Amino acid sequence: YFGCICQRQAHCYYPPFLWENDRRIYLDNELLPPGTPLDEGADPLDPHSYDKYTQQTYSPDIMYDRVLRFVNENRERPFFLMWTTPIPHSPMQAPDEMVQYYVEKFGDEAPIEGKGYFPSRWPHATYAAMITYFDRQVGGLVAELKRLGIWDDTIIVVTSDNGPASNSCSSTEWFQSAHPFRSGKGWGKSSLREGGIRMPFIVAWGDRIDRPHVNGHVGYFPDVMPTLCDIAGVETPPTDGISLWPTIRGKERRQQEHDYLYWEFPGGKGWVAVRWGDWKGLLRKVKEGNTQLELYDVRHDLLEEHDVAADHPDVVARMWEFIRASHTEPENPLFKMEIPEV
């Protein structure tokens, strides 16, 4: 393992150290607590007021170097690498050279205070710089795999843990990051709306995937392990997932389908969602005992604008059956969420 093991430390791209398994790897940075505001009396329009937020060692660079090192050290044998880059999560921090490239493209903009993160003089330019930075790192990894002669034997999956955040730091609405979905509060990250749980899932495997194509198959993260096990010829442990390998290689007719998909999110007031064919059931404010399940026909109402629960009580009843069958008591009490009786 290499990276951060502290949620608070992870909210700074210039931390004083990272972790390699059980030991600290110190970086040439000073401790700057997350959320540190501008100095008192500092001019928010002066770029130099933000100098303390850009230090010496950009942690994604060190993580990327370890990715390349791992690939080189294991090039003669099968390997599994999970690279969970913090880019482009808040706060908005990137090397100045790349930020200035986008300042020239976008022009001047209003700074942000940070709202619990670090302030930023050019939030749009910095967010774009972070996306470009990660894109170049992925390109560098692909180039290294080709140089080592293992590109055609390596599967790469690029995806995200959730939809765009609604805070002002990353300006996801300005960038239309969730397009065509909304990404404001209650619609993107930390929600079970389509803007919160629908995201790209990009797979590359040298020349072994028949042809580049886009597929609308509906799956979810429990499908990842069965998929990789299927490709590797390894027996899959019992899970809720189904291998997506037929879809990835363009054999959609051989793809096994889920009877339904189920999500829970205990954060905030609590969410539950069920996808059953073209129907999506959504239960909000679970922790408040809400039992008014919303129902959407996502084939015709992808943006979830028209709740048709009152018109389809039979579908709503079936959704509750799925919820009862799927909800289990979590081992971690922090994730506990009681499902209300109906």
Model-derived features with residue positions:
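Aromatic- and acidic-residue-enriched segments that line the glycan-binding/catalytic groove
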Residues: 18-20, 87-111, 169-180
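Loop/turn elements at helix/coil->beta-strand transitions in domains of secreted/extracellular proteins
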Residues: 1, 74-81, 150-156, 257-258, ...
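C-terminal cap/loop subdomain of S1 sulfatases and analogous C-terminal strand-loop tails that border
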Residues: 1-11, 164-194, 204, 208-213, ...
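A short aromatic-rich beta-strand->coil structural motif
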Residues: 51, 67, 80-83, 228-229, ...
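Active-site rim elements
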Residues: 50-57, 117-129, 186-192, 208-219, ...
